[in-house]
Amino acid sequence: MYLLSKARKKGMPFFATPYYLSLLDITGKAYDDETIRSYILYSPQLVETYGSIRAWEKEDVVEAGKPNAAGWLLPDGHNIHRRYPEVAILIPDTMGRACGGLCASCQRMYDFQSERLNFEFETLRPKESWDHKLRRLMNYFEEDTQLRDILITGGDALMSQNKTLRNILEAVCRMAGRKRRANARRPDGEKYAELQRVRLGSRLPAYLPMRVNDELVEILREFREKASAVGVKQFVIQTHFQSPLEVTPEAREAIRKILSAGWLITNQLVYTVAASRRGHTTRLRQVLNSLGVVCYYTFSVKGFQENYAVFTPNSRSMQELSLIHISEPTRPLYIS
């Protein structure tokens, strides 16, 4: 409580759903909850450095009218992040700029520090100007010759209300259709890359799986049908399960519903110290794979002094990879 009090005095937000807090062992005797406990409760180093945290990735530093470190000229504002030729991140001006919980190792902690991302839900509701801005952001994807993959995140993509999320997905679908029709008029050798994959980044399947209601599933199903007709081939919910403790009956039902809409679920494991203990991630992969979740990415904690307490050396990540049998279907495809 001392650390939380100190964090509050520094203006550092703390947010977790009652559902997720209920997964913690408050007795300290029933089971080992360190993986999820260290994910939402802050270390002394994080609290101490809050206020001076900077973007870990130089590409995430955006100045109006100037290319970022990767050489991409981006629209004004902080809605689009881009590091690679074929993919860009879209952060909507909606409640998607909040999360179901603030992860202690969050890659966008500097955005919470600047309050571009926050938990003041009323202030995050989309304003009338958002629809106009969304059209302008879609123009960026439509007019780019290389982009074929859009990752809608935040914050958390599923924090947006169903109506708002539907509007965003419909805008993406219209953009993909226009880009495809424009390509039909272009000669060979001058055609643009068409949208192939749409991803929604969300940790709500773990933080608040009840968010995956029937209306959301129908929105996902309808979008998949419409977007498939204009050439989109992959539909992915990209999530973070850290521990088998998170795979509750509610989470299993959320996974089942998403898969029933024809979307793929992929898991990015954030390789914290607690998650890196031998045997822990193996069990997590077994559980998720049995439910149809693809465990494809092990994410090394980035940052500086603020994440010292949860950083796992990359050598441990490589050791984990080497211990997984080649024939094992749970083997992650990437380590970053």
Give short role names for the model-derived ranges:
Residues E122, E128-N139:
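Active-site glycine-rich loop that binds ribose-phosphate moieties when present
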